[in-house]
């Protein structure tokens, strides 16, 4: 029983392989036909009649041949002059705001006033006479921009005094620096001499110790 089943299985496998081989052959033949039928041949020729024709290129020297060669102005020179004058009048004056305005300096005059006695007879002690104005004194209002130039008094010795003060200050600083430098040099010299004396003293003490030993 087992042998018959094995033989049947072997026969079935052989038939299956044969059918699969045939199926592959049929598929390959159908695919080859389809590819051969789908091939399309493209034309290799070019039709120059469909290309648009270019316009003729003109030379640049012939561009202004049709342009006018002269311009005629009608009306005469008088109309042109009036038009120019009208244009000049219409132009705005840009420098109008920059014109300086000159203002006259305002003067205030203080009138003389009589001193107030408050019932005190003349000659008695009253208010001081310095409170009463003796004469009319003109008061000149100074402008905020320039001020009163008449009250300026130039002091020619101010610059010389400042230069002398600066020179004296520099001289004092220089002398102080020299004194500090000399003081430091003397201090260093003193320390050097003390060290030298201590070294000689140790040397003498060592000699005395060697002799005693």
Curated annotation (Swiss-Prot):
Residues 179-213 are annotated as: Disordered. The modification Phosphothreonine is found at residue 41. Residues 28-213 are cytoplasmic. The keyword Repressor does not apply. Residues 163-211 form a coiled coil. It comes from the Eukaryota. One of its GO terms (biological process) is apoptotic process. The chain crosses the membrane at residues 7-27. It is found in: Golgi apparatus membrane. Keywords: Apoptosis, Coiled coil, Golgi apparatus, Membrane, Phosphoprotein, Signal-anchor, Transmembrane, Transmembrane helix. It is a single-pass type III membrane protein. Residues 1-6 are extracellular. The keyword Transferase does not apply. One of its GO terms (cellular component) is Golgi membrane. The modification Phosphoserine is found at residue 36. Residues 179-206 have a biased composition (Basic and acidic residues). The modification Phosphotyrosine is found at residue 94. InterPro entries: Cancer-assoc_antigen_RCAS1 (IPR017025). May participate in suppression of cell proliferation and induces apoptotic cell death through activation of interleukin-1-beta converting enzyme (ICE)-like proteases. The coiled coil domain is necessary for the homodimerization. Homodimer. This is Receptor-binding cancer antigen expressed on SiSo cells. The gene is EBAG9.
């Amino acid at each position: 029983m087992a042998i018959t089943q094995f033989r049947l299985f072997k026969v079935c496998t052989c038939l299956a392989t044969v059918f699969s081989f045939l199926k592959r052959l049929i598929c390959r033949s159908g695919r080859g036909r389809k590819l051969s039928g789908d091939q399309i041949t493209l034309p290799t020729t070019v039709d120059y009649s469909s290309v648009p024709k270019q316009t003729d290129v003109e030379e640049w020297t012939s561009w202004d041949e049709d342009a006018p060669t002269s311009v005629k102005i009608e009306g005469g020179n008088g109309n042109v002059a009036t038009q120019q004058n009208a244009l000049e009048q219409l132009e705005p004056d840009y420098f109008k705001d920059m014109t300086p305005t000159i203002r006259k300096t305002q003067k205030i005059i203080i009138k003389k006033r009589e001193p107030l006695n408050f019932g005190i007879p003349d000659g008695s002690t009253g208010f001081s006479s310095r409170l009463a104005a003796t004469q009319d004194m003109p008061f000149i209002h100074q402008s905020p921009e320039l001020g009163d130039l008449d009250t300026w008094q130039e002091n020619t010795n101010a610059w010389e005094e400042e230069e002398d003060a600066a020179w004296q200050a520099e001289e004092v600083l220089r002398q102080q620096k020299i004194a500090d430098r000399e003081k430091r040099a003397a201090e260093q010299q003193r320390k050097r001499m003390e060290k030298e004396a201590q070294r000689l003293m140790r040397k003498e003490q060592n000699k005395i110790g060697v002799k005693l030993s």
